[in-house]
Amino acid sequence: MDQSGVLLWVKAEPFIVGALQEPPPSKLSLHYLKKVAAYVRTRATERAYPRLYWPTWRHIACGKLQLAKDLAWLYFEIFDNLSERTPEERLEWSEILSNCTTKDEVEKQRNQLSVDTLQFLLFLYIQQLNKISLRTSFIGEEWPSPRNRPKSPSPAERSSCHNKNWNDYNHQAFVCDHLSELLELLLDPEQLTESFHSTQSSLLSREAVTALSFLIEGTVSRTKKVYPLHELALWQPLHAANGFSKISKTFSLYKLEAWLRACLTTNPFGLSACLQSGKKLAWAHKVEGATKRAKIACNAHMAPRSHRIVVMSQVCNQTLAKSSETLVGAHVRAHRCNESFIYLLSPLRSMTIEKCRNSTFVLGPVETALHLHGCENLKVIAVCHRLSVSSTIGCTFHIMTPSRPLILSGNQTVTFAPFHTHYPMLEDHMARTGLATVPNYWDDPMVLGGEGTDTRVFQLLPPSEFYVFVTPFEMEGDTAEIPGGLPPAYQKALAHREQRIHNWQKTVKEARLTKEQRKQFQVLVENKFYEWLVSTGHRQQLDSLVPPPAASNQVAKKDLTWSHGALET
């Protein structure tokens, strides 16, 4: 570690939210990205540098890299969602798009969008995180590596961190292994050889180091305040170590790289730190007969608000419902949760659901990405900025989203349906995350994985099978109906069903049954209703809405939780 007491680490969010869980196109390799980096710097007057506008990126991606336009926009939009914008600005953008009546009008509005060019290049490069590695596939463990690479996690940690997007060991290893390439991407063209390589005398601009803050941050002498990389790099006591020159306002590439390698350490707010020293949360109760107890932990007690993580595993055969300050703005990961009904009714930063089966997830608005992997027979109900699914079987998504759902590789029988529930604080939570009711692309998914453009991998829920979902809890708030309403076909199906019920009730009323007949009829209806509850699994949910007595004693005072079907403080 550097003697100044500086600690640097790789940020988790660019990988959790920004890196697609899919191998990148071959044209996003380092070879082509270096060409893109050189190209944009020579076209500063053409809206390419230092801000890259959508029309310029569209030209580069489609014309030079031969990417499909939808894929080019996907990368641009994902990165834009990572940029710092207020909820009000995001709602204003949604309103602008909702007023567009044609695709040409939408494209005209997109043409005004721009992103930081150098940070966008780094973002494109980290898509290599999920590149298929034949070496890793064959040997299972990394080859002998440089000393600065992190140690492999323990077997227990490895089982919990298998997802590369969540594994901070992988984040650090990726940046350490590719640090030279990342820095070369940020060099001005005159600092590179004809073959796009750096030299011992190459100099890096302050703007380039500022861009690197997209991936790296740190602290000094273990203080609680977290600084972006460029602020630490420009700190006077570190100039000799990192090669900054006040005269040229540049960094020596050779010294900067050595300094970065010396200071990089494991993310103190990452998943591994949360698993090792996070606060255990008694949100789930012990299920009789269960072989493993639910594990729920967070780092809220030690992490800044923007670095919050909540992880839950092995929640089985129960209803778990929370509306908690601990969840607000957190990256949440649910792992191996089975046969359960899970309600997380707070505004979330991101949500990842992995290897869960036969469960229902009802989520508060997800500000960035909602991703599912390796799940089977789930129902997911959420308002989210982006949904992506990979390796799922028989999952249904009732969603409201301003971007097209992503179907990655390995999915079977994916069903999309309109968002169909509400809870009292929903619209307030949507405003806090910058999510609006329009535009809403729930029914227009984008197939990206091995299935190519095969639309048979998904279906839209038939209106005849559609029912409104009632969130069975009480809490303060003003939302009393589904935000934005329902699509006409689904609203019509509900109205038709309600009319049939009304007609049936009228028929029963006009039948003039005797008291004994009414009693027999009531028993028959109740028995049929009970059979329906059991066959649909709703009986299990109703039973689990009443928690065991011990669970009520485990509630944190400031959290909202459930008791007898109501959310309470």
Swiss-Prot record:
Function: Plays a role in the regulation of centrosome and Golgi apparatus positioning, with consequences on cell shape and cell migration.
Family: Belongs to the TBCC family.
A GO biological process held by the record: regulation of cell shape
PROSITE patterns: C_CAP_COFACTOR_C
One term under GO cellular component: spindle pole centrosome
Native organism taxonomy: Eukaryota, Metazoa, Chordata, Craniata, Vertebrata
Protein name according to UniProt: TBCC domain-containing protein 1
Domain C-CAP/cofactor C-like: from-to ranges: 304-435
UniProt cross-references to Pfam families, sorted A to Z: TBCC
Gene: Tbccd1
Keywords: Cytoplasm, Cytoskeleton
InterPro entries referenced in this protein's UniProt entry, alphabetically: C-CAP_CF_C-like, CAP/MinC_C, CARP_motif, TBCC1, Tubulin-bd_cofactor_C_dom
Principal location listed in the UniProt entry: cytoplasm
Subcellular location: Cytoplasm, Cytoskeleton, Microtubule organizing center, Centrosome; Cytoplasm, Cytoskeleton, Spindle pole
PANTHER family, alphabetized: TBCC DOMAIN-CONTAINING PROTEIN 1
